[in-house]
């Protein structure tokens, strides 16, 4: 039976498996890329605030 234009085709088990695998890879990228990058950004902000607010000791 022909598919009509604009109507989405029914998802096969192969399509579902590929979609699940893609989601799993996306979750792995979150832990390997996003979290370390976020940690570096937070560390830079903390260092900047520390340097900007430390008392200057002039003798």
UniProtKB/Swiss-Prot annotation:
Coiled-coil region list: 9-31
Entry annotated with the keyword Transmembrane: yes
GO CC terms in record: membrane
Source organism superkingdom: Eukaryota
Transmembrane segments: 32-52
Mode of membrane association: Single-pass membrane protein
Pfam families: DUF4519
Composition bias, Basic and acidic residues: 9-22
Compartments in which it is found: Membrane
Keyword terms of this UniProt record: Coiled coil, Membrane, Transmembrane, Transmembrane helix
Segments of this protein annotated with the region Disordered: 1-23
Family listed: Belongs to the SMCO4 family.
Record protein name field: Single-pass membrane and coiled-coil domain-containing protein 4
């Amino acid at each position: 039976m022909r598919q009509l234009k604009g109507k989405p085709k029914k998802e096969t088990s192969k399509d579902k498996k590929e979609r699940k695998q893609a989601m799993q890879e996306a979750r792995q990228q979150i832990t390997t890329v996003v979290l370390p990058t976020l940690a570096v950004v937070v560390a830079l902000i903390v260092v900047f605030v520390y340097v900007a607010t430390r008392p200057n000791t002039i003798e």
